UniProtKB/Swiss-Prot annotation:
InterPro entries: Cystine-knot_cytokine, TGF-b_C, TGF-beta-rel, TGFb_CS. One of its GO terms (molecular function) is growth factor activity. Expressed almost exclusively in the nervous system. Residues 24-237 form a propeptide. It holds the Pfam family TGF_beta. This protein is produced by a bicistronic gene which also produces the CERS1 protein from a non-overlapping reading frame. One of its GO terms (biological process) is mesoderm development. The lineage of its organism: Eukaryota, Metazoa, Chordata, Craniata, Vertebrata. Its main location: secreted. This is Embryonic growth/differentiation factor 1. PANTHER family: EMBRYONIC GROWTH_DIFFERENTIATION FACTOR 1, TGF-BETA FAMILY.
Length: 357
C-alpha cells in the first residue's frame, strides 16, 4: 500500500504542480500555507471572517462556466479569457459600493433635480501587475412612489462637494432595472495600473411628472489580467482525466485531494471546498517506460536512459523520472480582505496524466 502523505506533504505536492517561474520563489522561512498563498497570487489570507454577503449570481455563473467538468461538454475554454464577458482576463472581482447602506443622499446642486449620491469602490486589493480589461458599473434604482415613469441618470467623476468632475455618461434609468455601463477608458484607464479608489457622482434627472427615486444597489464588476498567472500557449489535449492503472510501483497518477478546510481557509473560500490535485509517483524502468495503448508515449531519451540504466547503471545518472504529462486548471471563488467576491483562474493545478521523462 502506498504511504499516506501528511498535511505538509499535501501542500508541498500542490506547490510542485505549478511552474517555478510563475511567481518569485517563497522565502525559506515561509510555512506551507504562506507559500501556497504566494503561489495563488494572494499576499495574505483574509484577516477576519467576512460578513458572508450573498454571492452575486454573475459570479456563480462565471465560476460554473470555468468548471472543467461543465466546460468539456461544449467548446474548450481559452486560457486567460473570460468567455461570458468576451475579454481577456484571469481575475474577476465584484466590488460593492463601500458605503451605500449608510451614506445618505446629498442635496441637489441645481434646483428641481433629485438628490445626488456619491459611490466609492475600493480597489486597493488589486495588484500593480494587473491590467484592467473590463470595468462594468452596475446600478439599480427604485421608485419612491407608484407614479414614477423613469429618470435620466448622469454619472460623473467625483471631484469635490461643490464642483462635479467630467460627466462619463447619461442614460435612461427605468426603476427596478439593473443598469450596466462600461467605465474602462474613462473612470478606469486601459493598459495601466488600476487606481486605489474609484469615486463617482450620480445624479437623477426626473421627467415632467416623475418623482425622485433611491439608489438601491451599486457595484463594479472588474476584470483584470495578471500575466504572471498566464502560461505560454501550448497544445492541449481535451480528454477526460483518469487515475492510471498498471503494475504496482510503476509510474502513474496517484490521487491527492486538497481540502481548503484542512488548511483553515474554508471561512473565506466560497468554492470549491477542495479539489483533486493528484501527483505522479512510480518507477520508470523497462518495460514500463514504453507505455502501452492509452498512455502517453515516452520520449526517446527516456527510453534510452531506461535501457542504459538496466544494462549498465551509471552512478549519478539514474533512470527516467515520473513527472506530469498533462495538467488542467481550476478556478477559485473567495472573499478578499475588503469583502469583495473574487474569482481567480489558475492553470496547471490538477495532474491528469503522468509519464516518464
Amino acid at each position: 500500500m502506498l504511504p499516506v502523505c501528511h498535511r505538509f506533504c499535501d501542500h508541498l505536492l500542490l506547490l510542485l504542480l505549478l511552474p517555478s517561474t510563475t511567481l518569485a520563489p517563497a522565502p525559506a522561512s515561509m510555512g506551507p500555507a504562506a507559500a501556497l498563498l504566494q503561489v495563488l497570487g494572494l499576499p495574505e489570507a483574509p484577516r477576519s471572517v467576512p460578513t458572508h454577503r450573498p454571492v452575486p449570481p454573475v459570479m456563480w455563473r462565471l465560476f460554473r462556466r470555468r468548471d472543467p467538468q461543465e466546460a468539456r461538454v461544449g467548446r474548450p475554454l481559452r486560457p486567460c479569457h473570460v468567455e461570458e464577458l468576451g475579454v481577456a482576463g484571469n481575475i474577476v472581482r465584484h466590488i460593492p459600493d463601500s458605503g451605500l447602506s449608510s451614506r445618505p443622499a446629498q442635496p441637489a446642486r441645481t434646483s428641481g433635480l433629485c438628490p445626488e449620491w456619491t459611490v466609492v469602490f475600493d480597489l486597493s486589493n488589486v495588484e500593480p501587475t494587473e491590467r484592467p480589461t473590463r470595468a462594468r458599473l452596475e446600478l439599480r434604482l427604485e421608485a419612491e412612489s407608484e407614479d414614477t415613469g423613469g429618470w435620466e441618470l448622469s454619472v460623473a467623476l467625483w471631484a469635490d462637494a461643490e464642483h462635479p468632475g467630467p460627466e462619463l455618461l447619461r442614460v435612461p434609468a427605468p426603476p427596478g432595472v439593473l443598469l450596466r455601463a462600461d467605465l474602462l477608458g474613462t473612470a478606469v484607464a486601459a493598459n495601466a495600473s488600476v487606481p486605489c479608489t474609484v469615486r463617482l457622482a450620480l445624479s437623477l434627472h426626473p421627467g415632467a411628472t416623475a418623482a425622485c427615486g433611491r439608489l438601491a444597489e451599486a457595484s463594479l464588476l472588474l476584470v483584470t489580467l495578471d500575466p504572471r498567472l498566464c502560461p505560454l500557449p501550448r497544445l492541449r489535449r481535451h480528454t477526460e482525466p483518469r487515475v492510471e492503472v498498471g503494475p504496482v510501483g510503476t509510474c502513474r497518477t496517484r490521487r491527492l485531494h486538497v481540502s481548503f478546510r484542512e488548511v483553515g481557509w474554508h471561512r473565506w473560500v466560497i468554492a470549491p471546498r477542495g479539489f483533486l490535485a493528484n501527483f505522479c509517483q512510480g518507477t520508470c524502468a523497462l518495460p514500463e517506460t514504453l507505455r502501452g495503448p492509452g498512455g502517453p508515449p515516452a520520449l526517446n531519451h527516456a527510453v534510452l536512459r531506461a535501457l542504459m540504466h538496466a544494462a549498465a547503471p551509471t552512478p549519478g545518472a539514474g533512470s527516467p523520472c515520473c513527472v506530469p504529462e498533462r495538467l488542467s486548471p481550476i478556478s477559485v471563488l473567495f472573499f478578499d480582505n475588503s469583502d469583495n467576491v473574487v474569482l481567480r483562474h489558475y492553470e496547471d493545478m490538477v495532474v491528469d496524466e503522468c509519464g516518464c521523462r
